[in-house]
Structures are given as structure tokens and as C-alpha cells.
Amino acid sequence: MFVDLNSDLGESFGSWKMGNDDQILPVVTSANIACGFHAGDPLGILKTVRKAVELGVTIGAHVSYPDLVGFGRRNMDLSRDELIADVLYQISALDGLAKVAGSKVQYVKPHGALYNTIAHDQAQAAAVIDAIKMYNPELVLVALAGSNLVEQARAAGLKVVSEAFADRAYNSDGSLVSRRLEGAVLHDSAFVASRVVSMLKNGGVESIDGVFTPIQADTICLHGDTDGALEMSAAIKAELVKNNIEIRPFVNKA
């Protein structure tokens, strides 16, 4: 059994610091790097890209709605053409920086509100899928495990990797509990680490209302910007190793 570990990185902006990139990067196998639309400035993004390349971490474009003020967590009703252009712009920018650093973008993981919206909104999902195919149809799309997007993207010809979240609570339908609600984000490192292993071995987790919810995950997201993120990431990695679950990237870096 094996699994990929990913994290959202490159999200600092000028003097405003977000996350713990230098500490999280050695733990993960895939880096979802901001592209400037929800967070990240060019210099900070390039530094994160270079560090990822140095450590052999796979680079992914963490594309978002154009929402710096809201950190990409506000829904936007963009036209199809706008959304396609926004996604193309972001992938292109990050891929250019990755090329300078001696690597390339190998997957796309939408961020925040865009991630949640395209999990069920077929029109916006189609725009994101088409943008990825226009840029490079070999790019992998990271999507919420069990969401409609997984099958929609596969039917359109994209490679899709299903994602679960280590520190987020789930509703019984497999969706993430809104961050606005109490209990949406988990903070107990030992509990979260054990939960990740259980999810992988048993194919699901207990939802916030106590129902077993099936989740088949190929990659686990470790958030680097939550309280105790470093301790939690280390605990998860240690628990995976203890249970003989190999940690490796989901894409071929050749």
C-alpha cells in the first residue's frame, strides 16, 4: 500500500507570512504551489518552486478564483471564458517558474472555493477541465475523493487523483464540513495520524454525525497553515511508516 502526501505552499505575500513551507516540504511528496490569484507573490512562489525541486518534490499548480482579499475562499460566478483564461494564466505562470528552476508543473489542484464548487458544479468543472486539456492534457487533476468531478474529469480524458484531507471533518455525503462550523478542522495530532491510517486501510472515515463515510484516497492533504501543523505532519508520516504504508508521489517524475 502506498499514498502521496501533499500540502498547499507558496502562499506568503510580501511581508505577510503564511504557512511553514521550509518545514513542510521535506515531509510531503507533492507541493500545491499558489499561482498568485489567492495568495503568493512572484519571488515567494519562485523560492518555493526551487526548494521543491531541490528536495525532489512534485510540483502542482494550486489554481484559484481571482480573490486575494478573500484568500480564494469566496465563491465567484465567472463566465466560462473567464474561468478558462484564469486557470490557463495560473498554470502557465507557475510552469514558467518551474521551467526556470529545472522542473515543470505535473498536476493541477484547485484551491478553496473553486475546489469545493467544481466538486459539484458541472459547468465550472467543465471550464477547469477544458483549461487543463488546452494547456497540457497529460496534467493530472487532483479532486475531492467521491465527488462528481472525479468521474466528469475522467470521462473528459483527464487523469484524476482522488484526495482526502487529514485535518478536516467530513459530512456523511463525503463533502468537507464548512470551516464556519465548529469541529470542521481537527487539531489532535495523534488522532489525525491514526485517522489517516484507518482511512487508507478501511476505505473511509467516521463523518461528523457518526456515520461511516467511504473515501478512497490516492493523496492526503496536510495543511501547513493550521495550529500544530508541523507536529501533525510529522505524526502522520511516522504513523504511515509504522504501518508499512509507503509514501511516494502519485505522478511519474521521469
Curated annotation (Swiss-Prot):
GO terms for molecular function: 5-oxoprolinase (ATP-hydrolyzing) activity; ATP binding. Keywords: ATP-binding, Hydrolase, Nucleotide-binding. Its EC number is 3.5.2.9. It holds the Pfam family LamB_YcsF. GO terms for biological process: carbohydrate metabolic process. It catalyses: 5-oxo-L-proline + ATP + 2 H2O = L-glutamate + ADP + phosphate + H(+). Forms a complex composed of PxpA, PxpB and PxpC. Belongs to the LamB/PxpA family. Catalyzes the cleavage of 5-oxoproline to form L-glutamate coupled to the hydrolysis of ATP to ADP and inorganic phosphate. This is 5-oxoprolinase subunit A. It comes from Acinetobacter baumannii (strain ACICU).
